[in-house]
């Protein structure tokens, strides 16, 4: 190892705040411990501690720790809740949320500027990959469960700190229900919870999450997670960092359009236009942003068949099954990379709005 180099690096919110290089010599068949003194951290933010092992031919491997120093909650504001026959409006000084009792969160306005194109929906399906097709997996029940949803019950719970909207949604194709819960706090944030009861007898579940449809101007995508290339649960040997994409250019032109653009082990992501940033955070999630929905990709046989769109789609998931194909094409996803449906599925994330400088 005497010719090899170790590099250590500490990043805060994607910026290097400490780095260094050291070498060592280890006799064959022995081990040696080398202490690395990182700075004490107390400033809020997302951090990575990374050590790279580099030979004269280049970097060979790395090890990494990821952690967050949480910041204080935003200040509470006056929150006005107005309930009508079909809708519930929640108003702050410059932000307003509108919930339809049959459709969900149908509007987010900041200074009278609309952000959403459609209400967020639970999503359980992905555009089939070449490996899915090769393994003759269609997951048809989950396609229909993502497309055909019916709110069968709604209720609101209100207290001095928050207003909670609880939707019970019938998934016709699997004859089961899921729950989608929005909790609006008086700091303007929305906690979003998705729940599906356990059932190990179901068809393989491709993914479990929520898809948002925003106006196309929200095309600047950022995330803190594994990147910068696509990562999946069985393809996630990547560095955690802050990465940036533009949904106008992040499409991958496979011969047949298919699932792409996923990022694992994310803690935060955002979509922004010139003035407003929509943020979503979670302890652990997977995310992707695209100008195409999974149905756009699913329906097209060739890239030229994809439509011109006026929407940015953001998919946030607890987990997506792996992509499989360990024999290069057609092999089913290995069991350890499938979603475990023998346990209840619960996913929680928080949405909040910020203004760009």
Placement of each model-derived feature along the sequence:
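Carbohydrate-binding surfaces of carbohydrate-active enzymes
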Residues: 1-98, 192
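Beta-strand/loop-rich accessory regions of lumenal/periplasmic or secreted enzymes
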Residues: 74-357
């Amino acid at each position: 190892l005497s010719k090899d180099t170790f590099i250590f690096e500490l990043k805060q919110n994607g910026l290097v705040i400490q780095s260094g290089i050291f070498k060592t010599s280890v006799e064959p068949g022995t081990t040696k411990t080398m202490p690395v003194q990182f700075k004490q951290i107390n400033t809020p933010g997302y951090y990575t501690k990374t050590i790279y092992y580099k030979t004269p031919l280049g970097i060979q491997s790395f090890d990494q720790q990821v952690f967050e120093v949480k910041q204080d909650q935003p200040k509470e504001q006056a929150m006005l809740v107005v309930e009508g026959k079909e809708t519930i409006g929640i108003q702050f000084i410059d932000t307003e949320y509108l919930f339809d009792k049959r459709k969900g969160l149908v509007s987010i306005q900041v200074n009278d500027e609309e952000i959403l194109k459609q209400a967020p929906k639970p999503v359980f399906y992905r555009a089939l990959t070449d490996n899915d097709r090769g393994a003759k997996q269609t997951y048809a029940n989950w396609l229909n469960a993502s497309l055909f949803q019916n709110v069968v019950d709604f209720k609101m719970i209100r207290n001095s700190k928050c207003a909670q909207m609880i939707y019970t949604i019938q998934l016709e194709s699997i004859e089961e229900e899921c729950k989608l819960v929005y909790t609006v706090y008086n700091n303007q944030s929305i906690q979003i919870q998705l729940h599906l009861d356990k059932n190990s007898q179901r068809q393989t579940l491709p993914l479990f999450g929520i898809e948002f449809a925003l106006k196309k101007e929200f095309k600047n995508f950022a995330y803190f997670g594994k990147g910068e290339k696509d990562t999946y649960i069985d393809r996630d040997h990547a560095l955690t960092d802050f990465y940036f994409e533009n949904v106008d250019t992040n499409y991958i032109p496979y011969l047949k359009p298919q699932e792409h653009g996923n990022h694992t082990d994310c803690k935060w992501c955002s979509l922004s236009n010139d003035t407003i940033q929509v943020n979503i955070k979670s302890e652990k999630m997977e995310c992707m942003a695209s100008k195409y929905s999974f149905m756009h990709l699913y329906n097209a046989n060739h890239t030229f068949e994809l439509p011109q769109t006026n929407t940015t789609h953001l998919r946030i998931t607890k987990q997506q099954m792996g992509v499989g194909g360990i024999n290069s094409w057609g092999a089913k996803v290995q069991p350890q990379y499938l979603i475990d449906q023998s346990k209840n599925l619960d996913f929680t994330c928080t949405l909040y709005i910020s203004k760009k400088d």
